[in-house]
Amino acid sequence: MVFDTIAAISTFPGEAGIGIVRLSGDDALEIISKIFKPYKSKDIKKVKSHTLHYGHIVDPETEEVYDEVLVSIMEKPNTYTREDIVEINCHGGIVVTSKILELVLKQGARLAEPGEFTKRAFLNGRIDLSQAEAVIDIIRAKTMLANRYAQKQLVGYVGSKIKEMKDKIMGLLVHLLALIDFPEEDVEELERKEILETAKEIVEDIDKLIASSESGRIIREGLKTAIIGKPNVGKSSLLNALLKENRAIVTDIPGTTRDIIEEYVNVKGIPIKLIDTAGIRDTDELVEKIGVTKSKEVLAEADLILFVLDASRELTKEDYEIFDILTGKNIIFVLNKIDLPKKIDEKELKDLTKDGIIIEVSTVEKIGLEELENTIYNLVFRGDISLREDEIVINSRHKEALINAKKYMESCVEAIEGGYSEDLITIDLNAALDQLGKITGETATEDLINEIFERFCVGK
């Protein structure tokens, strides 16, 4: 596939030790030869591939030296895009990188669109679409666990699973076409039984991948963890303690937190999206009332609730009312302020929590915080909240395609069991193949491909 030559700054556009201007395309070597003066004069177009060269970037018109650089030369096909790639490693900073990019564009390159380097890797067949999406996940990973899953996808774990299912479906199509061309009653009955078994296996395989979509959301977006409780029990103090910084305002005045505060914290590799909410209580104060409404909305979407109770006060009607709206949720009861004289009634507490998990903490003395983090981690990995360290995770786009593929495969199973003709069965199988192809890109539309790569930053 032939494209023009593109260029972009691939590093952060600000003050930094090093900046990189990347080129990709058939004219990359020609362009760099016009603006790069290597040490010990040599023809940069004839050097060995995958080598690094010291020299200066010089404006060919004015002879002005722009910067002292190292230039990487990588010839196709063994490159990121499977095209000739040149990377100019210059000093960081907006001025130098921008001037070098400007010079490169003046020599005939085009400014790359967001994600265009990775898009070319896909269009040139080096990676499939699921691997391209893994690049975004690696860039956006909030923890090493998220990075680990993204790396598995990048090397083709998702694509290989999809290929296995597609190969099985292709095998079924071959069998069915043989039955259409060479119908023999005894053989046909045996073949249809085998086809039915394989079709059911494929449905099970699809189900396993669909089940991992919730895990994928947690890994990519973080475990949505709402800190809930009545006013002044120490919700904001708990947020600050877990973040190990003062992010939320803490006072003795009930109702201080009026809005939702969201922050990420890394708990043993799991990205936790902590959501500090306004204290839930009946109030006539308009702003606080809006905050309480928002808190209740957060509850509906939360994966985990940290229900904060005050150990230095007796349980109140407000505590019970809050518990009533938490039905069906994963809850950890956080008994805060244990550094103060305990006034909470143990029997009432047991009645309220119904043998739930209770962690005693003091956000002031930093007591119990590690136990709380361990409890969250164990909840996730023992299966109370869906996530397994050894599984392959998928995103919402993959899930939609898999659900559609499953629908067609179930229709295929029904058709075989109902004795329908081979021609009708092949329609469902081909439709399932089409859906699976959307995941890896073979049958993805141009609009879908463009939409995916528009999520990338320029230079990647």
From Swiss-Prot:
Binding site for GTP: 232-237, 251-257, 276-279
Main location: cytoplasm
InterPro entries: G_TrmE (IPR031168), GTP-bd (IPR006073), GTP-bd_TrmE_N (IPR018948), GTPase_MnmE (IPR004520), MnmE_dom2 (IPR027368), MnmE_helical (IPR025867), P-loop_NTPase (IPR027417), Small_GTP-bd (IPR005225)
Amino-acid positions noted as binding Mg(2+) in the UniProt annotation, renumbered to this chain: S236, T257
GO molecular function terms noted in the UniProt entry: GTP binding; GTPase activity; metal ion binding
Function: Exhibits a very high intrinsic GTPase hydrolysis rate. Involved in the addition of a carboxymethylaminomethyl (cmnm) group at the wobble position (U34) of certain tRNAs, forming tRNA-cmnm(5)s(2)U34.
Name assigned to this protein: tRNA modification GTPase MnmE
